[in-house]
Amino acid sequence: MVMLDLLSNALTAIKNAEAMGKRQVVIWPVNKLIYYTLRVLQRYGYVGEIEYIDDGRGGKYVVQLLGKINDIGAIRPRFPVKYREIVEWEQKYLPARQIGILVISTSQGVMSHLEAKEKKIGGVLLAYVY
């Protein structure tokens, strides 16, 4: 089976595990984009500890779930967004103004839309979570 979008597969695994009430999920295969996205989710309290296991086949992450995710998903296609356009995309993907985050890949790294607005930079939309 060919996996074309690893980030989408990882976020779907998290969503399904949360729906089943699991306490942890194993994400495999992995890459740096998945890791930095998970770090943003961890910083905002959506997931707990992230553990990397080197199995000799590219590794995997074991992510502790906290039961705080209602919906999570990758944004496809990955739209480029300017600093001033972030509010429009926030209204499109998030249920309310103060609920949830958009994950954005910027020239200064992967961060939430709140950090991008604070730093006044744009980037590429990767995912949403609330």
From Swiss-Prot:
GO terms for cellular component: ribonucleoprotein complex; ribosome
Gene3D superfamilies listed in its UniProt record: 3.30.1370.30, 3.30.1490.10
Record's keyword terms, sorted: Ribonucleoprotein, Ribosomal protein, RNA-binding, rRNA-binding
NCBIfam families for the chain: PRK04034.1
Superkingdom assignment: Archaea
InterPro entries: Ribosomal_uS8 (IPR000630), Ribosomal_uS8_CS (IPR047863), Ribosomal_uS8_sf (IPR035987)
Gene: rps8
GO biological process: translation
Matching HAMAP family: Ribosomal_uS8_A (MF_01302_A)
Name this polypeptide is given: Small ribosomal subunit protein uS8
Membership in a protein family: Belongs to the universal ribosomal protein uS8 family.
Molecular function GO terms recorded: rRNA binding; structural constituent of ribosome
SUBUNIT field: Part of the 30S ribosomal subunit.
Function: One of the primary rRNA binding proteins, it binds directly to 16S rRNA central domain where it helps coordinate assembly of the platform of the 30S subunit.
